[in-house]
Regions:
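Flexible loop/turn segments at secondary-structure boundaries
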Residues: 91-92, 122, 186, 194-195, ...
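Extended, hydrophobic alpha-helical segments in both membrane/secreted and soluble proteins
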Residues: 294, 301-308, 312, 316, ...
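ATP-dependent adenylate-handling active sites, centered on carboxylate activation for C-N bond formation
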Residues: 287, 332, 352-357, 373-384
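Short, glycine/charge-rich flexible loops or terminal/linker lids adjacent to PRPP-binding catalytic cores
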Residues: 313-359, 369, 396-399
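Amphipathic alpha-helical
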Residues: 145-158, 298, 310-328
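Positively charged, low-complexity/disordered segments
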Residues: 1-8
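Conserved short alpha-helical segments that host acidic/polar catalytic motifs at enzyme active sites
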Residues: 9-10, 14-228, 233-291, 297, ...
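A short, conserved beta-to-alpha structural element at the edge of catalytic cores
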Residues: 376-400
Length: 400
């Protein structure tokens, strides 16, 4: 975020539809663990089920990590055959309980469960327009604007997917979107393909996920990515695709490859680990330096450091011990929290860097919080020289 190309993106969506009417909450719960790196401020799960002729929805959400919000007792309260899960990093809207996703909207046509990853550039104008028509907002997030737009359009068209399409014609910005109604699940991606969204299948259960690693966690097979501008509708009758919103121009978020995504996932057919490895090799070609060892800043800098080492012939080393109980510093909501997190997250291995000329590879500089403190950490551990190399070129003016 900040000066990189994910300004205002709320972190991740995951949705599951079980054609056999099974319970989905546990699958969503485990899948969210695989997406925890994308957002650590809050999370939630909403499910829906049929009781006789009546459709009931349930939702549990709260501030904190997945394992802090949910336990066995809470999961037992969630019974449904369709559900939506979400983990959040706040960008548009404050980090408060009211802004936790997913959103459940009850209206004259029934119930919608909505989760959104992205940021709208015209959200303020759309919110004002909806308020003038009588809408009352309970959050400050873009996702509620999208949910209200879909619900309002649904009053005038025959299907939820048609309502999603009409809403997409009005919203501008970056979004990967999941909408679940009682008997169908819809995944949509903005025409530029800014953020990822993929489809998975396990037996008769279907999934949408921001990253394919969540599919692996629940034993689902990766089917394909949702294409930029595509609306995918899943019902008991099968899968339907509408690509009429597709654009000739794609503008994928480069920061997904640089930082956000897990290295074991693929985005639009490109392996994240391989892209980072290649970036490190190019960095060694363009910015060589004579040194004794190449080290990466865990975790997203490691692959680029390996690539730099492979290309330069300088040995690769592990210079840091990481505290696995500390989250990603970049997605902490406050500067003070980011600075404190750096100090407890990493510690330098004196045995590795003492008396050596060190090339330190990091994936990017967003706020500079991590890099400055880690350079001091390596120097304090006895390094003679510290040469910082950044595997991402600067991106200054992304509005999304």
């Amino acid at each position: 975020e900040m000066s990189a190309s994910l300004v205002g993106s709320e972190m991740c969506i995951r949705d599951r539809y079980d054609m056999d009417g099974g319970d989905v909450a546990s699958s969503i719960y485990y899948g969210l663990f695989s997406l925890q790196h994308r957002g650590q401020e809050s999370c939630g799960i909403a499910v829906s089920r049929t009781d006789g002729e009546k459709r009931n929805s349930q939702m549990i959400k709260g501030m904190g990590l997945v394992n802090e919000v949910f336990d066995a007792e809470k999961l037992e309260q969630l019974h449904g055959d369709i559900g939506v899960g979400h983990v959040r990093y706040s960008t548009a809207g404050a980090s408060i309980p009211e802004n936790t996703q997913p959103l459940v909207l009850n209206y004259i046509k029934g119930t919608l469960m909505v989760a959104h990853n992205g940021n709208l550039v015209n959200a303020v104008d759309l919110r004002r327009e909806l308020e003038l028509m009588g809408a009352i907002f309970h959050t400050s997030i873009d996702s509620e604007v999208i949910a209200y737009l879909i619900a309002r359009e649904r009053l005038h068209v025959g299907t939820v997917e048609d309502a999603v399409k009409l809403a997409m014609q009005k919203i501008r910005g970056a979004y990967s979107l999941v909408v679940a109604s009682p008997r169908k699940m819809i995944g949509a991606r903005d025409p530029f393909g800014f953020h990822p969204l993929c489809i998975g299948k396990r037996d008769n259960a279907y999934f949408f996920s921001s990253e394919s690693c969540a599919l692996d966690t629940v034993g689902a097979e990766f089917v394909r990515d949702v294409a930029p501008g595509e609306i995918v509708t899943i019902t008991p009758q099968g899968i339907q695709s509408d690509r009429s919103m597709a654009s000739d121009k794609c503008a994928r978020c480069i920061f997904e490859y640089i930082y956000f995504a897990r290295p074991d996932r693929y985005i639009d057919g490109i392996c994240v680990h391989s892209s980072r490895l290649t970036a490190g090799k190019i960095l060694a070609q363009e910015h060589p330096v004579d040194a004794d060892i190449v080290v990466g800043v865990p975790e997203s800098g490691n692959a680029a450091a390996m690539g730099y080492s492979m290309e330069s012939g300088i040995p690769y080393g592990t210079a840091f011990v990481k505290n696995s109980y500390v989250g990603r510093t970049f997605i902490k909501p406050k500067q003070s929290a980011r600075e404190s997190s750096v100090m407890v997250k990493l510690n330098a291995l004196r045995e590795v860097v003492n008396g050596k000329r060190v090339i330190m590879i990091d994936d990017s500089i967003v706020r500079g919080t991590t890099s400055a403190r880690i350079v001091k950490m390596i120097r304090d551990a006895g390094a003679k020289e510290v040469h910082v190399r950044i595997s991402s070129p600067p991106f200054m003016y992304c509005l999304l």
